């Protein structure tokens, strides 16, 4: 029977694409037939591999843990330990991975080199999750260990590069430029890899590390304000290793520096150059997008140029995820330039072309803004706007802030076409939706609170115009009680009502 399960698992893995989950199920059946502890541990490792390859990292953790606990002392413990750490990190169990490393180090159950490799994974995961200080702390603790090192020189260089990189991210620049320079010099003077030398770097590894260290060195100089030295290093990187990802990312570093000092012209030019040099790279659309953002920051007179950049992105990279956002930005700029008709076309194309897009509600609301601006006092045009905004509020999962904004604009369109009672109903329902539900009121962001305040002040005005001062006062007092924007206006209106009464 065990041979049957082996064959079934093998067949599942040989399929195209591989059926990792099915293979794991067959291996579980095989494991349950096992009597030997070592066989049990090995099959658990294989099951963990299947789940890992299926990106089910939580289950991979369980089976790797079981394999490690039953296979203590095997020559594959170090490899299995690293797989477990990698699965924990990918499953978001960073604290658990850190504790496992500390326990294994204290008990001496892993080699020094394996501990360093595990710390590499954990430190990068900590940084990605926003725990930069903790990542830096763990790496520095590792590097300060004075015990005799059995770590390969190549791994030591990688960890020291990581420490320097994290230091830059943490803005801890003291002595950093010198550390990076020494690291680069050490790498350059390392002898070439010889057969059987475990700690040597392959030419490919050495090249990759050198480009990353050069990029880091240029970044450090730029961050310190030494733009000439920084650009010198980045230029060297581009000249000598122009085809590498580090050379490409050097343009991002340069643009960020220009943006930081307010030189948006140079920042825009740098991002545009990146897109021109590497048009097939996945970063090219991002470069055009950022170039347009920098162009916007130059001032309103450059909005037409930014529109062209967003259009270039959308035209050249129609399948890129940034396409939708580039078109949204293009429409927003056209609105800022009072080209509401052009903006409306952009939004309508997005709505029709991407009916299920998660950001559709933004295009819908923006289109309604354009139609509202173009309608003026046209009765039919305002009616169309009201219908669109009413439908918008029926969209599932519409963020609360947008609910508040859409309701206020719907009521505004109704008021402009003379439908006061309907507008009052819309405003009242909007106020009740948020004020009547404490959780929703607290969940509103700054924009949502602004639109809710406008709705309530508008509702109060309608009540005043209808001589319903008691209801108007009640609405204004709710604005005051919830400390909404326009609170002082509400206080003034309450005082005026008291005088009239």
Go through the PLM ranges and name each one.
Residues 1-501:
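Acidic, polar-rich low-complexity tracts and alpha-helical solenoid repeat scaffolds
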């Amino acid at each position: 029977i065990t041979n049957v399960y082996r064959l079934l698992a093998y067949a599942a893995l040989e399929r195209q694409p591989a059926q990792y989950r099915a293979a794991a199920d067959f291996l579980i059946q095989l494991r349950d037939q096992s009597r030997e502890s070592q066989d049990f541990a090995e099959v658990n490792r294989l099951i963990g591999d299947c789940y890992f390859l299926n990106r089910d990292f939580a289950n991979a953790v369980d089976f790797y843990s079981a394999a490690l606990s039953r296979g203590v002392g095997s020559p594959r413990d170090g490899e299995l330990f690293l797989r477990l750490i990698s699965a924990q990190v990918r499953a978001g169990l960073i604290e658990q991975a850190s504790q496992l490393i500390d326990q294994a180090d204290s008990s001496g159950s892993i080699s020094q080199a394996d501990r360093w490799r595990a710390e590499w994974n954990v430190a990068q995961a900590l940084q990605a999750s926003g725990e930069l200080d903790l990542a830096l702390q763990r790496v520095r603790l590792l590097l300060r260990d004075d015990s005799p090192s059995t770590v390969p020189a190549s791994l030591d260089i990688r960890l020291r590069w990581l420490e320097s990189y994290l230091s830059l991210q943490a803005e801890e620049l003291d002595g950093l430029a010198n550390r990076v320079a020494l690291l680069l010099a050490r790498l350059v003077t390392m002898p070439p890899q010889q057969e059987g030398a475990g700690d040597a770097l392959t030419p490919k590894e050495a090249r990759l590390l050198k480009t990353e260290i050069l990029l880091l060195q240029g970044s450090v100089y730029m961050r310190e304000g030494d733009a000439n030295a920084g650009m010198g290093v980045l230029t060297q990187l581009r000249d000598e290793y122009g085809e590498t990802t580090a050379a490409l990312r050097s343009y991002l570093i340069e643009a960020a520096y220009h943006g930081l000092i307010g030189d948006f012209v140079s920042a825009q030019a740098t991002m545009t150059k990146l897109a021109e040099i590497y048009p097939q790279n996945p970063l090219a659309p991002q470069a055009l997008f950022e170039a347009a953002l920098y162009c916007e920051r130059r001032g309103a007179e450059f909005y037409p140029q930014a529109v062209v950049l967003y259009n270039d992105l959308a035209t050249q990279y129609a399948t890129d995820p940034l396409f939708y956002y580039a078109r949204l930005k293009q429409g927003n700029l056209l609105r800022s330039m009072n080209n509401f008709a052009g903006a409306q076309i952009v939004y309508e194309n997005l709505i029709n072309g991407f009916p299920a897009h998660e950001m559709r509600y933004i295009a819908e609301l923006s289109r309604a803004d354009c139609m509202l601006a173009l309608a003026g006092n046209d009765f039919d045009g305002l009616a169309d706007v009201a219908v669109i905004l009413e439908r918008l509020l029926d969209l599932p999962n519409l963020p609360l802030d947008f609910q508040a904004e859409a309701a206020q604009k719907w009521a505004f369109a109704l008021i402009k076409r003379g439908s006061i009672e309907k507008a009052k109903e819309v405003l009242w329902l909007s106020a009740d939706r948020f004020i009547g539900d404490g959780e929703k009121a607290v969940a509103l962001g700054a924009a949502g609170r602004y639109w809710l305040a406008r709705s309530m002040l508008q509702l109060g005005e309608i009540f005043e115009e209808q001589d319903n001062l008691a209801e108007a006062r009640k609405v204004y007092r709710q604005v005051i009680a919830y400390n909404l924007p326009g609170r002082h206006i509400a206080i003034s209106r309450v005082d005026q009502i008291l005088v009239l009464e």
